[in-house]
Design a protein with these regions (language model features):
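Conserved HGGG/HGGXW glycine-rich cap/lid loop of the alpha/beta-hydrolase fold
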Residues: 7-71
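Conserved acidic catalytic loop of the alpha/beta-hydrolase fold
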Residues: 81-98
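Gly/Ala-rich beta-loop-alpha elbow adjacent to hydrolase catalytic centers
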Residues: 102-106, 110
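Flexible "cap/lid" loop of the alpha/beta hydrolase fold
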Residues: 111, 115, 123-151
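Conserved alpha/beta-hydrolase catalytic His-Asp/Glu region
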Residues: 135-138, 155-204, 210
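Short beta-strand/loop motif that positions the catalytic acidic residue
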Residues: 214, 220-222, 226
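Conserved alpha/beta-hydrolase "acid-adjacent" motif
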Residues: 227-233
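Catalytic active-site module of serine/aspartate enzymes centered on a nucleophile-bearing elbow/loop
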Residues: 243-276
Length: 276
């Protein structure tokens, strides 16, 4: 297990690697909440979550960029800029081409990575992904509300709202965000989270018009009860990509990795197909 930092223009990206089997290497990207705190210090949690993937392949978990200047967060946290930083990081690690397993905001970053650096990507696993955030959508409205609360430092209210919106519409709350709401923590690097949310609302981050260029096999998973990224948004991504398969869970909300029935089994089978 190794944790290293990689310099990129205006900041750095931390990576955590688990070495193992000889299949196509896997790169893992989380959602926008990844920006709450640096990757360092979470290694044991990451190892427990991803050690199952290492039976067949090396796994590298990538953090969001850490800007040298916090005031530069919105620029460096733009999904396309992050994708360029990830490309530089993978080349520095000597890893690639790779499979990508990404969730939510990490999915849009992965789409840009595949469009701009196609030589680095062999397969995509995208959970709760959207390629755009229409300004008049409920998704955009909720993100703007998150930004307002975060900038005001109202973290208790913020996490309580997240606990409700991350759950499936039929659940009481999302466990992880519910616990955070009760603890009312202040994230270590809120500027990264806020910066990525603002960039995600910027039309320059929308990648819908480029989806037809992505020819690699893609497994796209969505919860039909997702209150953050509606199923229609994820369906749009699957429809525009020529080699994408959409699989849905009727009872799952936004937390696809932890709540989608059979998630790991589906992903492992899809990744194994690329090892042949």
């Amino acid at each position: 297990m190794t944790n290293t930092a990689h310099e990129i223009p205006g900041g750095r990206i931390e990576s955590f690697s688990l070495a193992a089997g000889g299949g196509v290497p896997l790169v893992v990207l989380g959602g926008v909440e990844t920006g709450f705190r640096p990757l360092g210090g979470t290694e044991q949690v990451l190892a427990r979550r991803w050690e199952g993937r290492t039976q067949r392949r090396q796994v590298t978990v990538l953090d969001r960029p850490i800007p040298d200047n916090p005031a530069d967060a919105e620029r460096i946290m733009h999904p396309r800029v992050i994708a360029d930083g990830i490309a530089a990081t993978l080349r520095g690690l000597g890893v690639g081409p790779v499979a990508i397993e990404a969730e939510s905001g990490g999915g849009r970053i992965s789409l840009w990575l595949t469009v701009d650096h196609p030589e680095l990507v062999e397969r995509l696993v995208l959970a709760a992904v959207s390629s755009e955030t229409p300004p008049d959508s409920l998704m955009a409205e909720r993100m703007r509300r998150w930004i307002t609360l975060a900038e005001a430092g109202h973290w208790g209210t913020f996490f309580a709202m997240m606990a409700q919106q991350m759950r499936a519409a039929t659940e009481t709350e999302s466990a992880a965000f519910g616990a955070a709401a009760r603890l009312q923590p202040r994230p270590a690097t809120p500027e990264r989270f806020i910066g990525e949310l603002k960039a995600t609302l910027d039309p320059s981050s929308f990648v819908t018009d480029r989806l037809g260029e992505i020819a690699v096999p893609a497994l796209i998973l969505a919860g039909e009860m997702d209150q953050v990224v509606p199923l229609a948004s994820t369906q749009l991504v699957a429809d525009r990509m020529p080699n994408a398969l959409l699989v849905t869970d009727p009872d799952c909300g936004h937390t696809v990795r932890s709540s989608f029935v059979g998630y790991d089994r589906l992903v492992e089978r899809f990744l194994a197909e690329g090892d042949r």
